[in-house]
């Protein structure tokens, strides 16, 4: 969820775009490429927003424009941050005993 504090810009949500401005609350439910979202400052002024998250221990994101998948989670020494091409294929049992 995002709260637009000041400025204006564009929200890209799937294939749609919408103008956003100060005072707007935005909710972007999870899903596939059809729910990918991006906030774009296409104005000449500063765009400021607050992002609110569930802070779940792990997050998987699809990047449809670049064909990647990212997996993120944890903190400190156990932190996970992994990006890979979406079409990379690895068998579940590869290198497993």
Language-model features, listed with the residues they occupy:
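Double-stranded beta-helix
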Residues: 40-97
